[in-house]
Amino acid sequence: MDGIGEGHGPNGMGYDMPMLMNQHTPIFGAYGPEGSPVTTALPNPSLHDEASMSIGDDNNDAKRRRIARACDMCRKKKIKCDGKMPKCSHCINYKTDCVFTQVEKKRNPPKGAKYIEGLENRLGRMESLLRLSGLLSEDDGKTDLGTLEKRLADRSLSAGGYNATNSPTRFSLPLNGQPSQPASTSRHSTPRVDSHSSPRTAATSPESQKESENEVEGLSDMMCSLVTNNCGETRYIAYIDDNKWMYWKPEIFSDVFARRVFKPLPPKEEALSLFRDFFDNFNCMFPLFHEPTFMHLVEKQYSRDPYEGSGWWASINVVLAISHRLRVMSNLVPQEEDKKAWLYLKNAMGVLTELTMRNTDLLSVQALLGMSLFLQGTPNPQPSFFLVAAAIRLSHSIGLHKRGSGFGLNPVEAEQRKRVFWIAYMLDKDICLRSGRPPVQDDDDMNVELPSEDPPDNIGNVPLFDGKGKFNMFRTLCKFSIIESKVYKRLYSATASKQSDGALLNTIGELDRELEEWKDSIPIDFRPEHEIKATHGPLILHIVVLHFAYYNCLTTIHRMSVHHGYWTSRLSNYAIQGLNARPLNPRVFLSAVLCVTAARASINLIKYIPQGDFACVWLILYYPVSALVTLFANILQNPTDARARSDVKLMNVVVNFLSTLVSDESNGSIKRMLGVCGEFERIAQVVLDKAERESQSKKKRKAGPEEPRDSPQAASTTSTKKNTANTSATMPFSPPPQYGADSQDSSSNAANGATAFTSSQTMPGTSSISDMSGTIPAMPRASQDFTEMLGPNALDGLNFNSQPPLTSTGDVPIAQPFQQPFVPQDLWQMPMTIEWDWADMSTNFPVFDSGPSH
């Protein structure tokens, strides 16, 4: 038995020990090529026997290789056989025949062999994936890992790395055991495992922490990969699965995936004309498709061998639908042509199940986004919500949310992937901010760059009117969507609601500053708060939407401070006491003024909207109606405002705009919206008339002998109540009784400059809305019914009511009716849009009556 395992070789066992992998320089001990232990790292070689120390002796190697096992006699006696020829020493002494019987013994696999085999299989699969994605050539499979790592590092350095002296304390140990030069790191460099790293840690060195973040990001970027199958579908490497729908096609789903055609494709000449309208008027600002690629597939579609992919079928029908819609909006064709657009959309919707359940290609994402853009021009936003969410989820499966520097894509394809993702991102964040629903895309789990500012195909660029420059509107809209995302996440998310007063005020100031910087980066020709000078119809619509979105975002930021009443004495005291950790943005003190000014500017944009029942109206209808509610709340709060009369006229502009949309019985939702907005306008007019009468009455009382304070006001209230009840039907609305007078904070407001909407509130004789309870008949649960009438964001303007009127001269305090907002914060954050509310108010809508008789 002692002879077993003393030597291994072809003479003894018939095979050599396998070379498992590239041999490393031994550090703590290893095994030689023959499988014997190498003990160069051990301090006392005398602990081993002579045979184990004589590995380098050729004669001894030959003898040891010859003794695969002891002779038969020595094995029988269980003594050590020296293996001498022709007889061993023991056989000579015992005078017996020395016979070596060769017995084939199958050795058990060494411990860990299955684990190593598994690693080899996994490595082989990884190499095959890398070859499929183009990251690894056929010869790279034989390349040493250290060489491959060095090649990747050199490639990243040539792409823009910085000097190696930026990280002098970091070294990497190559496989040959020689220390290398200090390794340079960059944003895209290959992360190295440090064998002899500096004792500095991230906790003690901010620089090392930053380097670590860059390395992790670089590693994440390099680990991303795409794999394209034989059908042309591209999958993100993180989504690879053997159980694909393309292999699992049970018969029960055959009819679900059947392609139903509601309207055949038009002739080629007509189709080319429609496609030209799409790319000239829509895709130039919203680059959903790459025109050369799309037109190549169009030529193939009208050939004998068309491309049969469901993503392409949906895409071509979506483009036809949008093209017909554009012609109807431009009055180039009759309104009846819109029916063709809907039929082509139905063609695309016919493969919706297949797009979401089976496909993983870019065309499917583009088709879903195109359907969402088309359906935004409808009263019901629910389909658009679903389609955008599906498009973003599908974009994750093909890696659109990642930078993709290692995907091996050509610049044109990489740019188009960025454009498609940013379109989905913009739609997602716009839905999020307007509806209060959480976004689908997490900003912390994406690193794709913005679209190019000056792309070769000139997509997104708009020439300036002086002819000396151009402006990329698409990239600007992408930047704006990032700000929208921050506004929701930092002000309206569940986590944001837990902020302290100081954190909330600072957040409002920071977001306002970022929004203003974005606005100032826009050329004067297209900048919000400036006159629109464009003459091209489709371009005007894009600019109008840009301005509407800016004013809405500005209001969404500042209404948070109005909602909490921070712009009253609470805000002033907070700043005076020095509770803020850093200086506040001065515009925080002007939140209410900014909201009302933005509402006025939004209504003034109505003149640029195409008149008539066009689909684009539903896209922007939210903005003017929300602005009307903002002005309505301001008039209720400040009826003596110098611009109150002009604000009522602006409300009338919105009412007239809605009246032009009511063309048939199918627009029931617009009719209900028109009824509510018209009633708001009428109530605002009543409030202003009452305020003027009260002001004149108080002036007369000051001029004449002093009378009891309560008698005239009571008489006036009674008479006004009777007059109002007899003139016309009124909306059953009145402020809740808890909005009583409390003038305690008025003096501090006057002292600290936290004024109301305009300086006209210092006029004597300012009346409160609580005094007008007779003018507007009482209604139980007013605040609850009010929230049922309006969508969450449309009601946000009503939060402008926290500013109390300043105290008038004398000892008569002016009542402060709206110390609390109309709507609690959790109500106007409900996941609904104003369009959805207006369309589904048949059961919640209050009945307009004359109120209770007196």
UniProtKB/Swiss-Prot annotation:
GO CC annotations, alphabetized: membrane; nucleus
Membrane-traversing stretches: 616-636
Compartments (UniProt record): Nucleus; Membrane
The species this protein was found in: Emericella nidulans (strain FGSC A4 / ATCC 38163 / CBS 112.46 / NRRL 194 / M139) (Aspergillus nidulans)
Segments of this protein annotated with the region Disordered: 158-217, 691-779
Gene name of the record: atrR
Membrane topology according to the record: Single-pass membrane protein
Record feature DNA-binding region, as residue ranges: 71-98
GO molecular function annotations of the record: DNA-binding transcription factor activity, RNA polymerase II-specific; sequence-specific DNA binding; zinc ion binding
Ranges annotated as biased composition (Polar residues): 163-188, 198-207, 755-773
Protein's name according to its UniProt entry: ABC-transporter-regulating transcription factor
Cited InterPro entries: AtrR-like (IPR050987), Transcription_factor_dom_fun (IPR007219), Zn2-C6_fun-type_DNA-bd_sf (IPR036864), Zn2Cys6_DnaBD (IPR001138)
Keywords for this protein: DNA-binding, Membrane, Metal-binding, Nucleus, Transcription, Transcription regulation, Transmembrane, Transmembrane helix, Virulence, Zinc
SUPFAM superfamilies with a match to the protein in the record: Zn2/Cys6 DNA-binding domain
Bias (Basic and acidic residues) ranges: 691-710
Protein role: Transcription factor that regulates expression of the genes related to resistance to azole compounds, including clotrimazole and miconazole.
Intrachain S-S bonds: none
Primary location: nucleus
GO biological process, one term: positive regulation of transcription by RNA polymerase II
Keyword Magnesium found: no
